[in-house]
């Protein structure tokens, strides 16, 4: 008697991570297909993905190129007949030993630790597949660190530094800039092609899909859609996800408290960041200090209008705009303002996208520290405002990540 072939239903249920809607999605997507939420247009699933083996080879290439990108000079400055080299690591080290260890630590996390960790995690996934290990923590951590990998921001900071240093001496671009550019491009490519949802399903095939809209739950950590019957309990009898074991009972009040706490901390830090000098240059013994806004003005006076715009946008406009947007969205939640829901979601997506670019100014400071340090003739120093600026960027990024977009949609659904 021939065996009957079991086939899965043509459609499964996915719960949107942005608006909480339950959507029918094809069980199998072709390589050129993707599924979007019809209500908020958030990407639910994509058939586009590279094999884990290919992603691991790219991650391995990143790790091979990383020593050349971090340790070797990207730029060289010719000053008074002396050649001064600038590398990422050299700038961070000089900043740390110069008394600005907290600012250096923030740059070290975003420019060194997170890119290396990202590549290592992808390779760990590949090894986990070979040795048939369930890499729950690796998959969770990959989802958390993507916003903190800032090699592309450092690449733009390099361009800003070139325009800033050319006022003082002749600048030379070294051949090691090529592996740095390739590292930034490969990291960005890996971001695009790494499909975390597909990897979760690949490593945890026993976590089956849902085919009914009755009593459906969503894990905020691994984005797994499951029925209430599948809910697990940890050793403390708290509700957790059956796939990643993350807690599910976090109340809306706690989410708002975390968002408010980090946002208020960011607002407090932004005042000294804008009022105190962020950098200073000693020229023949005379100190010339710059705040964020005076640095932009100096670029305008020198005729570097595009660079002035980039620095103004990343260092002044973006941090302040992020705070006003987050205050507006939080006010919408607390006072139940039902404005244009799509406009509110666009603002939230904009904050998520541009927030990391505020680190541009700190990366420029690190490069300047490694280039312009020549004793009594010319010397560059980091100002006290640099730490507060970095802390403000970190706090506002944490605030954005803590904010749950479903809180806005709940107002919209309640009014309907």
Swiss-Prot record:
One cellular-component annotation, GO: plasma membrane
Membrane topology value: Multi-pass membrane protein
Gene Ontology biological process: membrane organization
InterPro entries linked to this entry: PqiA-like, PqiA-like_proteobact, PqiA-PqiB_transport
Transmembrane portions of the chain: 62-82, 107-127, 138-158, 172-192, 263-283, 306-326, 347-367, 377-397
Protein's cellular compartments: Cell inner membrane
Superkingdom in the source lineage: Bacteria
Keywords in alphabetical order: Cell inner membrane, Cell membrane, Membrane, Transmembrane, Transmembrane helix
Family recorded in the similarity comment: Belongs to the PqiA family.
Protein name as it appears in the record: Probable intermembrane transport protein HI_1671
